[in-house]
Amino acid sequence: MATKTSNFVSLRVSLFILLLFISSQVAIADAKHLQQLRRKLQIVRRSRSQRGRQYNPPTLRVPPPPPPPLPQMPSAATPPPMPQLSPLQPKMHVSSLQPQMLYPPPSLPYASSPTST
């Protein structure tokens, strides 16, 4: 029976301490709120004392015009268009291992011949 009473007393004491803590927190919050209200009241009193001043409505800010569009550049992901070969030029077979040749190579016998000049 003695342990039940001591448990009950300790429970009541802990609840009382908890109640004191909560009430102190509420009092602190009320004091902060009251201080904010006092500041607002002082601001209103100052603005009422300056009634002789003319009211200037806030000016509207006009957004700047949009920048001119940038010239369209071909993106790096798309290759440049292939030049069109005329029907007189022979079509060349392009291998994936060799560089792409757009025109047929010059004929070698004439270029390397020492007697061509």
Curated annotation (Swiss-Prot):
Highest taxon of source: Eukaryota
Comp. bias regions, Basic residues: 42-51
Keyword set, alphabetical order: Apoplast, Cell membrane, Cleavage on pair of basic residues, Membrane, Secreted, Signal
Gene Ontology cellular component terms for the protein in this record: apoplast; plasma membrane
UniProt feature, compositional bias: Pro residues: 60-84
Motif (SxS motif essential for MIK2 binding): 47-49
Location of region: Disordered: 42-117
Signal sequence, start to end: 1-31
Expression triggers: Accumulates upon infection by generalist herbivores such as Spodoptera littoralis. Induced by wounding.
Positions occupied by motif SCOOP motif: 41-55
Alphabetized GO MF terms: LRR domain binding; receptor serine/threonine kinase binding
Cellular location(s): Cell membrane; Secreted, Extracellular space, Apoplast
Subunit organization: Interacts with MIK2 (via extracellular leucine-rich repeat domain); this interaction triggers the formation of complex between MIK2 and the BAK1/SERK3 and SERK4 coreceptors, and subsequent BAK1 activation by phosphorylation.
Cited function: Brassicaceae-specific phytocytokine (plant endogenous peptide released into the apoplast) perceived by MIK2 in a BAK1/SERK3 and SERK4 coreceptors-dependent manner, that modulates various physiological and antimicrobial processes including growth prevention and reactive oxygen species (ROS) response regulation.
The protein's name in its UniProt record: Serine rich endogenous peptide 5
Species in which this protein is naturally found: Arabidopsis thaliana
Lineage: Eukaryota, Viridiplantae, Streptophyta, Embryophyta, Tracheophyta
